[in-house]
Design a protein with these regions (language model features):
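Non-heme di-metal
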Residues: 1-216
């Protein structure tokens, strides 16, 4: 089983589309205040992805990193895009009246830490790939739920989801190519540890949202 097959097996164990929170989202069974609470929490994860990519880009710019200047520049552009997406998330949070200044729950803080746990450019890339390769399906599920179940119209409040439903196919493909070129000399177990931390962190963030709503 190659690296990406192993990563997919880990993803199957932490498939957030099977989490009760997202299942209720799809079925229209979340209260609006639960959506608002989630929006405030997940904002920290959106920031963490941008921070992780920014750190990876900075590491890749080091001449000893094994990345060339074009690859480092590509990572820098990707990081800048994700930083801009924080504002898109805040459009969604604002429609819900979410408190984006609230301190994150412990589960959310742990998620952010796992998403930024990469110690070098390759580990940061693996973290980003793990997140973004799953995002199209997750973002599409969320978008469909918002429009079909919660009365949202596609527009500024849902742009984060529509963008990630499409754009992350490209981002994940770019990251995968950079990762594949470096696997022969990499510590695969460490990279899979990073990936599992990312996936578990996302799952547990949702656990925290359920606990906050008294569902656990």
């Amino acid at each position: 089983m190659d690296f990406f097959d192993r990563l997919d097996s880990i993803r199957a164990r932490w498939n957030v589309l099977e989490h009760p929170f997202y299942q209720r989202w799809s079925e229209g069974r979340l209260e609006r205040d639960e959506l608002a609470f989630y929006a405030g929490e997940y904002r920290h994860a959106v920031i963490a992805l941008a921070d992780s990519l920014s750190a990876a880009a900075a590491d890749a710019a080091d001449p000893d990193s094994g990345f060339d200047s074009d690859e480092a520049g590509q990572l820098g552009e990707h990081a800048a895009e994700e930083a801009e997406h924080v504002a898109l998330w805040e459009e969604f949070a604002g429609i819900l009246g979410a408190d984006v200044d609230r301190s994150p729950r412990p589960e959310t803080r742990a998620c952010s830490e796992s998403w930024t746990a990469g110690r070098d450019a390759l580990e940061g890339l693996v973290a980003a790939f793990t997140i973004e390769s799953g995002q199209p399906a997750i973002a599409r599920t969320k978008l469909d739920g918002l429009v079909d179940r919660y009365g949202f119209e596609e527009g500024p409040a849902t742009e984060y989801f529509s963008l990630h439903a499409d754009l992350d196919h490209e981002h994940a493909a770019q990251s995968r190519e950079l990762i594949e070129e470096r696997l022969a000399d990499a510590d695969l177990e460490r990279l899979l540890e990073v990936a599992e931390g990312v996936l578990r962190g996302n799952w547990e963030l949702l656990d925290g949202c359920d606990r906050a709503a008294g569902r656990e």
